[in-house]
Amino acid sequence: MMVIGRTCIATFRETIWKLRLNFDVKEQMMKRPIVAANWKMNVLPSEACHLAEQIRDSTTGLGVEIVLAPPYTHLALLSHLRSSQFSLGAQNVHNANSGAYTSGISVAMLKDLQVEYVIVGHSERREAFPSEKDLISDKICAILEGGLKVIYCCGESRIIRESGKEMDFVASQLAYDFRAVKLWEPENVVIAYEPIWAIGTGLTATPEQAGAMHNAIRLWLKSHYGHENAEATRIIYGGSVKGSNASDLAAIDGIDGALVGGASLNASEFSQIARAFRHHHQ
């Protein structure tokens, strides 16, 4: 009986050690900096592989998760570049699984192309397609239920910022868009704060402004989904992120990465941004 008892204890200890190891690895993966390249409607298919390979090669080994979100037409061409540090993302998705939705792309289609992330709620789509805001909740649910990950975008206009109500506005966006999400999955949701007034304008929120909003978003997550889920969720910044300002943004506690637009069309500058987040999160 004594031998059996010792064996059981040893097995139990080994199991606990493995669980703790897995938990530590999972926790590190969830909080690993993430820098996403949103190519928007740029780069021809004939040019995509060369630029994507440059981005991959210049960011390999940094310990930063890179997500490349090219136009739909490039996804199949770039699927061979995927690795543990380099993922494919889509810039949008339809909320339905299939059906008579001309031009629609479903989660299942993206998953079949080895896509891992989907951007939803980007300010450019919110502005160009006003009805988009009423579909975001359904898209988030479709993405998570389909086994993919969400990069959710939120942010305020200049008018709202100048009125001093930016915190309340972003909180209302979060509440409305995540109203159907009952169980938070921090490893599957990335929140990108992108002030609308900084998108494509050359303007950038100051590190203090960005940091304050990131803290407010995390506090909202804590109040709705709990402390551990909030702390494990990566909150990133988007809004004219460039090589010249990335280091200042990366130095702010609570900013876990960046959603990069125009600067992602230049592999050297994008690499500079990724390196900034590597240095400040080691």
Regions found by a protein language model. Name each.
Residues 1-2:
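Methionine residue identity
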Residues 23-282:
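Active-site loop-to-helix "anion-binding N-cap" substructures in soluble metabolic enzymes
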